[in-house]
């Protein structure tokens, strides 16, 4: 929808251009965060640099290789599977629209502007979205959230006061910067059992009960 209005602004001189500008500004100004219901936020994802995320094609191939059966199933598996399905469908429609726009825009400058917008802006958003949900399915949502917080703390800490290497998601339990709040469970050392003097009759009845 944003791309549609952008095309109108670039290529049309009809009265709908002004309306498209207003609608495009409204869409960009909407406070919609696709990560809120999963405990994350756009700000948390923004701590990760753009070159951190694989290409959309690689992410789609990864999702298909790992979760193809669940993604193609008519059953509801999890909110992350549903989000991946929707993102995959939206990306396919966006590519079809971008191809159509590229074929029908005569002005090379306008065509390059549309292609650049899709690749830079929309492409990054889809890469972030796909990476987040694939990672949540692979490592668990709590681990991914902990990683995002840990990376955010690391990247904002001056180099002189932080470890030389950034946290790595696959090794997070060993290298995380920020641990989850709350007491860690204590390991209780087994105490030696007290020997009780039992009569032979009591011992026999106990062994009979354990067999049942």
From Swiss-Prot:
It holds the Pfam family Hepatitis_core. Residues 184-212 form a propeptide. Residues 1-19 form the signal peptide. It is found in: Secreted; Host nucleus. Keywords: Disulfide bond, Host nucleus, Host-virus interaction, Repeat, Secreted, Signal, Viral immunoevasion. GO terms for molecular function: DNA binding; RNA binding; structural molecule activity. Residues 184-205 are annotated as: 3 X 8 AA repeats of S-P-R-R-R-R-S. InterPro entries: Hepatitis_B_virus_capsid_N, Hepatitis_core, Viral_capsid_core_dom_sf_HBV. Residues 165-212 are annotated as: Disordered. The keyword Cell wall biogenesis/degradation does not apply. Gene3D superfamilies: Viral capsid, core domain supefamily, Hepatitis B virus. HAMAP family: HBV_HBEAG. May regulate immune response to the intracellular capsid in acting as a T-cell tolerogen, by having an immunoregulatory effect which prevents destruction of infected cells by cytotoxic T-cells. This immune regulation may predispose to chronicity during perinatal infections and prevent severe liver injury during adult infections. This is External core antigen. The lineage of its organism: Viruses, Riboviria, Pararnavirae, Artverviricota, Revtraviricetes. The gene is C.
């Amino acid at each position: 929808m944003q791309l549609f209005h952008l095309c109108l602004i670039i290529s049309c001189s009809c009265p709908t251009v002004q309306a498209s500008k207003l609608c495009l500004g409204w869409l960009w100004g909407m406070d919609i965060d696709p990560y809120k219901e999963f405990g994350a936020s756009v700000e948390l994802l923004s701590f990760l640099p753009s070159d951190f995320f694989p290409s959309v094609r690689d992410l789609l191939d990864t999702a298909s290789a790992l979760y193809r059966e669940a993604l193609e199933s008519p059953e509801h598996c999890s909110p992350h599977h549903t989000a991946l399905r929707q993102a995959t469908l939206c990306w396919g429609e966006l590519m079809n629209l971008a191809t159509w726009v590229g074929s029908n825009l005569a002005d090379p400058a306008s065509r390059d502007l549309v292609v650049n917008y899709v690749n830079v802006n929309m492409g990054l958003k889809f890469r972030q979205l796909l990476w987040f949900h694939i990672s949540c399915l692979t490592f668990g949502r709590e681990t991914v959230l902990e990683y995002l917080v840990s990376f955010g703390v690391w990247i904002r800490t001056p180099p002189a006061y932080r470890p030389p290497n950034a946290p790595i998601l696959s090794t997070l339990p060993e290298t995380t910067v920020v641990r989850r709040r709350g007491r860690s469970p204590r390991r209780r050392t087994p105490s030696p059992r007290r020997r009780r003097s039992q009569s032979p009759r009591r011992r026999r009845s106990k062994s009979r009960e354990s067999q049942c």
